[in-house]
Amino acid sequence: MQPTPKSESELLLRAQDLAGSTLGELAEQAGIITPPDLKRDKGWIGQLLEWHLGAMAGSKPIPDFPELGIELKTIPIGYSGKPLETTFVCVAPLIGLHGLHWGNSHIRHKLARVLWVPVEGERDIPLADRHVGSPLLWSPSIEEEQQLRQDWEELMDMIVLGRVEHITARHGEVLQLRPKAANSRALTEAYGANGQPIKTLPRGFYLKTHFTAAILARHFIL
């Protein structure tokens, strides 16, 4: 793995150096085998870029570059230049919610400063041949943070009221909550409608594609 970058500008410079390379080239440099597809290795692209950029956090609940307070997010892009799928941010807390508010939430911490790295994502392009795009460093604008906060508060209210199983991907304007589990047996605790403990699938917060598309469009003037 590459050494951890010491500044935001060093990190951005490194990410810019990767732009134009294929995933196959980057994997070869890192001595990592490129899988045939991402069916069993959903996080493979992120891990490959973490290696090249010197990210330290891995799956810990802190930003990928803790010293810089920056989170790394890869974003698969289609031929249209638009994101192909929603972006996972973090696992949602379903119990122990007393005293939790937007200001001290894990999701706000994760989205405070993000290094977005677009990657070709169309399935007809072999994984090894997909190119990495130009990176951008982003922090939410006042308006974006307001949108995120509003959705988060609405979703967390439903969780607190024991309505987690009633939440669908349609709830939220820019943020959605949906099950995140490799298999349906991986259950976790939550509150039921009468405050009783229930078992349910873990949930994750995801950014909707129109939100991430707007970030890219503003930066790259698509």
UniProtKB/Swiss-Prot annotation:
Disulfide bond entries: none
Domain of life: Bacteria
Official protein name in the record: DNA mismatch repair protein MutH
GO biological processes: DNA modification; mismatch repair
HAMAP family (alphabetical): MutH (MF_00759)
CDD domains the record matches: MutH-like
Family, as annotated: Belongs to the MutH family.
Chief location of this protein within or outside the cell: cytoplasm
Gene3D superfamilies in UniProt: DNA mismatch repair MutH/Restriction endonuclease, type II
Keyword Nucleus belongs to the record: no
This protein's record includes keyword Hydrolase: yes
Subcellular location, record wording: Cytoplasm
Organism of provenance: Photobacterium profundum (strain SS9)
GO molecular function: DNA binding; endonuclease activity
Role, per record: Sequence-specific endonuclease that cleaves unmethylated GATC sequences. It is involved in DNA mismatch repair.
UniProt cross-references to SMART domains, sorted A to Z: MutH
